[in-house]
Amino acid sequence: MGTNPFDIESFDRSEEQPAKPSTPQYPGGGQSAAQVVITALLVIIAFASGWFGNAYVNRNNIATGDAQLILQAWNDINQYYVVTGSIDNKKMAYAAISAMVDSLGDTGHSRFETPEQLAREQQQLQNAPTVGIGVYLSGGGSKPIRIDAIIPDSPASRSKLQPGDLIVGVNGKDIQGMTIDQARPLILGKKGTPVTLTIQRTTGGTTSRFDVTLTREEFTAPTVVSYIIPNLNIAYIQVLQFSSDADAQMRKALQEANKQHVQGIILDLRDNPGGYLDQARAVASEFIKAGPKKNVLIEKSRSGQQTQSVLPGGLATNTPLTVLVNQNTASAAEIVAGAIAINRPEVHVIGETTFGTGTVLKEFMLSDGSAIWLGTEEWLLPNGESIYHKGFTPDQKVALPDNVVPVSPLVAKEQHLTAKQIIDAGDTQLNAALNDLTNGQAAAAA
């Protein structure tokens, strides 16, 4: 499965939100857009100056020292740069804020978000209906952007798009070499508006290009998808992200698996970018027996550390299990994989070393509706090990060939795939998991 359509990362909203900043008054009455952005920048300078306590930031102080350099540069640009039409105060402020957060080195996690990005992320994590075309993507940059799966009841599901298709253009613009983040704004848009994708497809050694026009519509992306693999009677369950209903959807999938008396479960966390911490804890607890010293993770902050214990009532604590991860398994998904591996040593984790997130985020709203997410806690595996910037290493390292589209329960269910068809698809990581649960007899049993 490819990355989540909106690349949602892990965060924890359980703490009280910081106080909203007061609004400085400027000469001339009302506030211009530039003044609103300057307010946001002043808030960030307060962070840069180190003025924050355990509960909230004192945003009424004026920056001194190194932070004053930002305002000096800002004033010099506005006062002296000759091409005045090129000066975009909001763009400068957002760039400065992003650069400050990026300098922390919490790559792929602590970050700045515009109001639009924040709204889209919150919508996705609440599993609310979203507007788009309904595809999961992977690749980008040095690799082509590929459709890995299509969301049911979405515009893409009603088109001739297929998993494995490469998107090489959007509305006539060549996107080869773009990252998914760069291409996404071209694909997304307002409800009811059209978008034309240029698709490259290879079938039987023949490559063709054609255009597909879709109308962007509202749809709801699933959080958990599952498929009982015929003949093998193995439940293949994938968590796409840890949104607000992840555990509720997981329990439904596990109840169905238990009803079918499955022989084992494959928990696929590949390309899962994370989500809510409480949902990660709840999902991990479905597979781990609760008890003394049974923890999902350890949270370490400036003031000390605390443990998050395994919750009682898990539905699959005795079921044979294999977990799949890859380099895009991040944050909350890494918490789940690590918790299962530490608490159930008989369970094998298969795939590639994970992303290595390692921090718990807290949201700090800025005055114009944008926000910064800061890692205010580091999380550790139940044994005290940190995976920050190094990732979690699976028991069995298995790479997925570049030319192979990973199988997913979405695809398997849509196409009613047999066990043999799944094995023949060449998903080396999934096949390794099937062999792990069948003692190497998956192909024979299929």
What are these regions (language model features)?
Residues 2-108, 143:
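Terminal targeting/pro-maturation regions of precursor/exported proteins
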Residues 23, 40, 55-62, 148-163, ...:
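Cleft-lining beta-strand/loop regions that shape enzyme active-site pockets
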Residues 81-146, 194-196, 200-213, 220-226, ...:
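Extended, small/polar residue-biased N-terminal targeting/export presequences
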Residues 97, 136-147, 151, 233-238, ...:
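PDZ/PDZ-like groove recognition
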Residues 168-169, 373:
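Hydrophobic beta-strand signal
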Residues 366-378, 393:
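Short acidic, Pro/Gly- and aromatic-enriched capping/linker segments at domain boundaries
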Residues 385-446:
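Conserved functional hotspot residues or short segments at active or partner-binding sites
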